[in-house]
C-alpha cells in the first residue's frame, strides 16, 4: 500500500483520510476562534483578497471546496445573487455542519454538500470559479484534486488556491517557533487539543512551496498560473485559468 505524509509522519494513504477527518471533527466547533487567534485576524484579510481576485458577478456558478465554516461561500453567494449558484462543500461532516449553520444564521441560502475534492460530483465545465482555501495541503492526492478542479471549471474560468506557503527566509526561525511552540499551546488552552494544532503546523511545512504548487497547477492543465504572496509568504494565493 502506498505511503503518504500526515504532518511529519509517514502513513498509509487510506489511513491519512481518517486521521485528517479526526483532526477536523475535533477542531470544528472552535475553528473560527482559533483562526482569529492563530493569524491575529489576518485570515480575514487573506480571504478578502481572494474574494476580490475571484471577481464573482451576478449569475456566476461557484464551487468552494473544503469550504469549512463558509467565509468564502457567504461572500460569493451575495455577489452571485439569486441568479447564481454557489456550493459550499467539505469532505468533513462536522465542518460542513458548522458552515451550513453559519450561512443560515447570516441569512444566506446556498446549497451544501459533502465532497471529496479528488472525485468532485459535478459535470465538466460547470463552474465559473472554483476555490479552495486552506484545504489543499490536507488532501492525499493533490494532483488528482487539482485535475478535478480544472475539469469542473468552464473555459475562461478560474481555479484559486489560498494556502499556507513558504515564508520569507529571514522570518523562518521566528515562524518555526510560533508554529511549533505557540500554536500547540493555543490549541491546548483554547480548544483542549494541542495535537491537532501540531498536525496543522506540520502539514504547513510539508505543503509544496509557491513555485512547486504553480507547476502542479500547470501539470493539471491550468494556464496562466500566477501567485500572490501575502504577509511575507506566510500565505500565497495561486490563480490558474482553464483556456
From Swiss-Prot:
**Which pathway is it part of?**
Quinol/quinone metabolism; menaquinone biosynthesis; menaquinol from 1,4-dihydroxy-2-naphthoate: step 2/2; Cofactor biosynthesis; ubiquinone biosynthesis
Q: Which InterPro entries match?
A: SAM-dependent_MTases_sf, UbiE/COQ5_MeTrFase, UbiE/COQ5_MeTrFase_CS
A Gene Ontology biological process term: aerobic respiration
Q: Which reaction does it catalyse?
A: a 2-demethylmenaquinol + S-adenosyl-L-methionine = a menaquinol + S-adenosyl-L-homocysteine + H(+); a 2-methoxy-6-(all-trans-polyprenyl)benzene-1,4-diol + S-adenosyl-L-methionine = a 5-methoxy-2-methyl-3-(all-trans-polyprenyl)benzene-1,4-diol + S-adenosyl-L-homocysteine + H(+)
| Record's keyword annotation contains Methyltransferase | yes
Pfam families from the UniProt entry: Ubie_methyltran
Xref: PROSITE patterns? SAM_MT_UBIE, UBIE_1, UBIE_2
Q: What is its EC number?
A: 2.1.1.163, 2.1.1.201
Q: What does this protein do?
A: Methyltransferase required for the conversion of demethylmenaquinol (DMKH2) to menaquinol (MKH2) and the conversion of 2-polyprenyl-6-methoxy-1,4-benzoquinol (DDMQH2) to 2-polyprenyl-3-methyl-6-methoxy-1,4-benzoquinol (DMQH2).
Which family is this sequence assigned to? Belongs to the class I-like SAM-binding methyltransferase superfamily. MenG/UbiE family.
The molecule here is called: Ubiquinone/menaquinone biosynthesis C-methyltransferase UbiE
Task: State the species of origin.
Answer: Ralstonia pickettii (strain 12J)
Primary gene name: ubiE
Amino acid at each position: 500500500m502506498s505511503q503518504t505524509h500526515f504532518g511529519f509522519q509517514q502513513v498509509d494513504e487510506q489511513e491519512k483520510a481518517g486521521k485528517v477527518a479526526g483532526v477536523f471533527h475535533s477542531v470544528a466547533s472552535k475553528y473560527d476562534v482559533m483562526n482569529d487567534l492563530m493569524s491575529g485576524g489576518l485570515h480575514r484579510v487573506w480571504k478578502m483578497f481572494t474574494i476580490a481576485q475571484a471577481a464573482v458577478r451576478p449569475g456566476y456558478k461557484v464551487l468552494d471546496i473544503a469550504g469549512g465554516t463558509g467565509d468564502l461561500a457567504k461572500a460569493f453567494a451575495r455577489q452571485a445573487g439569486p441568479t447564481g449558484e454557489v456550493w459550499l462543500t467539505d469532505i468533513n461532516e462536522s465542518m460542513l455542519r458548522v458552515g451550513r449553520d453559519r450561512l443560515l444564521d447570516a441569512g444566506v441560502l446556498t446549497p451544501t454538500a459533502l465532497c471529496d475534492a479528488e472525485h468532485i460530483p459535478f459535470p465538466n465545465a460547470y463552474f465559473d470559479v472554483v476555490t479552495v482555501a486552506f484545504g489543499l495541503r490536507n488532501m492525499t492526492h493533490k494532483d488528482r484534486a487539482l485535475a478535478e478542479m480544472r475539469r469542473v471549471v468552464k473555459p475562461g474560468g478560474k481555479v484559486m488556491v489560498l494556502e499556507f506557503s513558504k515564508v520569507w527566509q529571514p522570518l523562518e526561525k521566528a515562524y518555526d517557533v510560533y508554529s511549533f511552540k505557540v500554536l500547540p499551546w493555543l490549541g491546548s488552552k483554547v480548544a483542549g487539543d494541542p495535537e491537532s494544532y501540531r498536525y496543522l503546523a506540520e502539514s504547513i511545512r510539508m505543503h509544496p512551496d509557491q513555485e512547486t504548487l504553480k507547476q502542479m497547477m500547470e501539470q493539471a492543465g491550468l494556464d496562466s498560473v500566477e501567485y500572490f504572496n501575502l504577509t511575507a509568504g506566510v500565505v500565497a494565493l495561486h490563480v490558474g485559468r482553464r483556456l
